[in-house]
Amino acid sequence: MEREKGVASRYRPFVDSLYERTPANSTVVSKKARERLAEHHAEKVMRRYDEDIVRGWNAAVRTFRTFPTIFRAQDFTRSKFEEALAIVRANSFEVTRADGVRERVLVPLAHLLVHDTSSSVPCVKMVDDTFVINVDEHRAGDELSCSHGEYSDAETFARFGTSAVYSEENNARDVITFTFPDEVHLKEEIGSCGPAEDIGFTRDGASAELMCALRLVSANATEWSEMRKPNFDLQSLKNRPLSEESEVAVYDALFATLTDLLNSYPYSDVDDEHLLRGDRLADDERRAVKIRLREKRSALRALNTVQYRGRKALGGVLFDKHFSHIMPTRVKDEL
């Protein structure tokens, strides 16, 4: 996809360098070689690889059909997909999540290369056998950018390509799920709070399941001793805090998550609305922007509700003491 976009793609230089470093034909396994793998562990690995190809291609086809202008089917063939998947496999590493699901991680080469921030145009070049990439000016901690545009195909795919819901209307559950990092060693206890798909944010703020999970991971040693008693009902944490100290930590996590999410969008609501008022978007591009805007609005409504409930639960004085630097006044939902 990024290779087809040419110089307009901010990721094209990185993708090209992957292909240059790992020629596709170097990853091909011949039929004869496969036969020799029979009854060996490597045969299972190859079978998993084949299954990944089938699953990935089926998901890609669904995406092409949903966004035909962004992802033109004639640009993406099964052979190209298999080639790209082979490149990713050759330049990535596999991790297994706490729930047993395997994921393959491709570290963006942009973070491994020397950067030149003096240019505002996408550019990659070799200087003394070193890749140098020109990127836009940025502040420390900002995501590096190598191109300009009102929307990005890669961004759209990254946010919505693996979603089961492609609609500008609210989905059936209208929830932004919250995933705990793998280093949280309370997966079984968190499971007592409710199904993973219910742990998240809705327009009504943090779900009861999310509040329960956050209260679990925010508990101090004394509170944990209490919760380990046989008669303690973990589900009661959906509706009641453990202590003032722990509840402050819970709301700190809620605000940090929602503000990070809202700040992660590369375009403002005004930008998206401007795009939607114009006539430059194809139908599927318009749908993608609406999906993004809907998610953003859901997050903003959730933030407003969390702020209201936090002030009510902790009291105005305590709430302002801990969170006035984040939100000195109530967030106004103008959407």
Where are these regions (language model features)?
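Long, positively charged leader/targeting segments at protein N-termini
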Residues: M1-E334
